[in-house]
């Protein structure tokens, strides 16, 4: 248990979807800072690490199935550096928010989380909705802007502004978000 949890959203991705062409270059830019953030979270006694990933409509899929599909997908190089370790907390989701129809809020409350770092993809979709759901649950939100990837640069920038202004999210870097 710690005061801070890092939630990695939707990074187990096959990159075989209509938005992949626009998304891939942006994900490529965040892999190193995100991998560093994940590595620091894994080794810290003061940070909890949770992966939440879309189940892509496969309600029978285990998290390991989703990871396997991502590693077999079009861009395994964007997946390998950030694959969750065997002892990592993982869960699947069915919609944009990592909170919707998941046990995330329950888990974070059990861990006594006081601060939530949200990283992953897509900034203007799943990151935004997860941040909003965290905010309405009274979790202070931190967004490492170099560890989130968007599809549309203009919408992603607007989403970051909305999170900062409307949700009091702290916008920082992956290197600085854990202190």
Predicted region positions:
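A short alpha/beta connector and helix-capping loop motif
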Residues: 20-41, 45-51
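Short beta-strand segments at enzyme active-site cores
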Residues: 47-54, 59, 144
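Metal-dependent catalytic neighborhoods of phosphoester/phosphodiester hydrolases
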Residues: 60-65
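Active-site-adjacent betaalpha module
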Residues: 1-5, 36-46, 67-179
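N-terminal nucleotide-binding beta1-loop-alpha1 segment
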Residues: 5-11
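N-terminal beta-strand-loop-alpha-helix module at the start
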Residues: 6, 17, 30
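Short acidic, Gly/Ser-rich segments with clustered Asp/Glu that frequently serve as metal-coordination loops
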Residues: 12-18
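Short, glycine/acidic-enriched loop or turn micro-motifs at the edges of active sites
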Residues: 13, 57, 149
